[in-house]
Every structure is written in C-alpha cells, then in structure tokens.
C-alpha cells in the first residue's frame, strides 16, 4: 500500500509538472568548455537557469545553469509560425487570438533576463499581441499586457514601440494631458525652430525630432492629434460656460484663439497620421480620417467655406468606401455633395 501511494504521488507529480509548465519548445543547448550539443525540450527559464526535458511533453525537466550555456538553437513551433504568418498577412484580429495563446504557451521563458534569452518567442508573443490589439482598435484591452511587456526580455529594437504603448494606454484611459505631454517629448522645441515667432513656421507645424521611423511617426501624429483635439474640446466647454458680456470679452477671445490654434494643429496631425506611412497601418489611417471629419465640422469657418466642405465630402466618401462599418451615422450629412453658394452667379 505504501509503495502504491508513493507511485500515485510520483505520477501526479509528473502530470502536474507537465500541465503547469509552459509548452515545451524544441531546442539544442551548447554546453561546457567542449561545447557539446544537448537537444531537448525547454519548459521554462529564469534569470540564472534553463529547464530542459528529454521528452516532447516536457516531463521531468532538468535544470542547467545558463552561465554554462554558450548558445541556444531554437526550433520554431508550428503554432508560432502560424501566428507570425497571420501577422505578415495583416490578419490582426486572428493574430491577436494566436498571440494570446502563444503568450500562455511560452510564458515560462518570457521573463528570463539572461542575454541568451533575449527576444525569445514568449517575450515576442506579448509584444505582437499588443500590436494586434492596437491595430484593431482594442485600446482598453492593451492595459494588462502593457504591464507585462515592460517585464519581458526584448532588445533595443523593440523599445521605441514599447514606449509608444504607454501613449496608447493613456488614450485608453482618456488621460489627455499626460498623453499630450508625452507626445511633446518627440517634437522639436518651439524655441529651437527659426521662424515660429515670425509666422515663417505656423504653430501647428511643429516637426518631430530626427531619427523617428515613419511607422512610429504615424502613431505620434495621431496620438498628438487626439490629445490636442480632446484638450481643445475641454477648453471649448469652459468657453461655453463663460457668460457673454463686455467684461468677459477678452477672456473669451483668448480662449477662442487658443482653441482655434489647437484644432488647427490637431487637424494637421490627423492628416499627417493618415498619409505619412502611405496608409500601411490601415486601422490608424481610418481612425485618423474619421476623427478629422468630426474635427472639420467643429471649425468655425466650415459652414461658409465651400472648399473645406468639398474636402470633407471627398474624405467622407473615401472613408465610407474603404470601411462602411467604421463610418459614424452622425457624419452621414458629409456624404451629400455640398452646394457651391456661388454657382450660377
């Protein structure tokens, strides 16, 4: 009876280890001074050790000091290849599900900070999951993996986008002031641009710092536009709450001027976001179009400016043609061709 109990305990232990560990990944470890190759199945790794089983199901893994390992050659799992294929085909909705599964499957290696574990697929899965969420507009769902992506072992080439994930987290939380301040860190200071004070360069054309790639620039322009747009809306509420009188005229004019500059800047940035990367980030381009249409209708000159009305009509037709599902019903009036007030004169 005693031996039977021990056997059952041992069997349960093996089963529990197999179930609780991450999905094993086939790999070959090069170990020792003689650089011998040891094939096996990696189940997990921490900052100091890597755990390898001789069995495909990952049972009974043995720990090896990463300090004794000179190289690790990974074999890409089929489910990982399928997830990357979805990414490469721009199928981000399906990709988000695939990378979420990969996050769970390979979580056992994601957090290891050892240099040999840098850019492992467990860490990459968190990154690609966040990117799929971003590209499909699931911004609030990015909050939990955003905490996680900061902990995984990804190299320098991933860090610029990881930093931008913070901006999307601000957007998800409607934190417009922190988002706007964050976007200011990417732009050249106004005092460093000759001509801003003399109207050679308009205040809504503040350029970004050198060295930012176009993929990130598109996101920065959109996030800067969105935060500026929303902050202008907050100022507009303040303006509407001020009593109209001679005593408040100066205050109202000052606020109105600030709102005008901010909305002009936001509109410029929306246009940049949708065009700078040739629309390669389709979701971002569509959102930029939609939000710019909302903004155009708020511009004081829109009601009498036929040129602006024609531009809004053309963009509305384009957006509705590209993705009718994203086109808001409250903008349906823009689908009607505007009438030139000077026609026939």
Label each region the model flagged.
Residues 1-8:
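Bacterial N-terminal signal peptides that target proteins for export
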Residues 3, 291, 334:
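Short acidic/histidine-centered micro-motifs embedded in hydrophobic/aromatic stretches
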Residues 21-181, 188-241, 247, 251-282, ...:
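Compositionally biased alpha-helical segments
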């Amino acid at each position: 009876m005693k031996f039977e109990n021990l056997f059952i305990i041992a069997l349960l232990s093996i089963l529990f280890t197999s179930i609780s560990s991450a999905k094993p990944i086939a790999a070959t470890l090069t170990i020792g001074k003689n650089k011998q190759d040891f094939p096996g199945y990696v189940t997990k790794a921490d900052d100091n050790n890597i755990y390898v089983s001789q069995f495909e199901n990952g049972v009974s893994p043995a720990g090896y000091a990463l300090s004794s390992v000179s190289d690790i050659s990974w074999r890409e799992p089929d489910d990982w290849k399928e997830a990357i294929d979805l990414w490469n085909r721009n199928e981000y909705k399906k990709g988000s599900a695939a990378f979420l599964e990969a996050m769970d499957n390979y979580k056992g290696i994601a957090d290891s900070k050892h240099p040999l574990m840098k850019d492992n697929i467990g860490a990459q899965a968190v990154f690609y999951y966040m990117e799929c969420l971003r590209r499909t507009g699931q911004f609030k769902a990015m909050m939990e993996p955003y905490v996680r992506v900061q902990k995984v072992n990804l190299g320098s080439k991933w860090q610029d986008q990881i930093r931008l994930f913070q901006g999307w987290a601000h957007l998800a939380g409607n934190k417009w002031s922190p988002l706007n301040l964050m976007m200011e860190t990417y732009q050249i200071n106004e005092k460093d641009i000759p001509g801003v004070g003399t109207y050679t360069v308009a205040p809504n054309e503040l350029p970004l710092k050198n060295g930012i790639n176009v993929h990130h620039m598109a996101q920065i322009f959109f996030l800067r536009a969105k935060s500026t747009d929303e902050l202008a809306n907050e100022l507009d509420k303040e303006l509407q709450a001020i009593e109209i009188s001679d005593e408040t005229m100066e205050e109202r004019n000052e606020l109105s001027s600030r709102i005008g500059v901010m909305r002009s800047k936001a509109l410029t940035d929306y246009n940049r976001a949708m065009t700078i990367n040739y629309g390669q980030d389709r979701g971002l381009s569509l959102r930029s179009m939609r939000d710019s249409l909302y903004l155009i209708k708020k511009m004081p000159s829109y009601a009498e400016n036929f040129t602006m009305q024609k531009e809004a009509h053309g963009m509305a037709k384009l957006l509705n043609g590209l993705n009718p599902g994203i086109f808001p019903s409250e903008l349906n009036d823009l689908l009607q061709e505007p009438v030139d007030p000077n026609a026939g004169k």
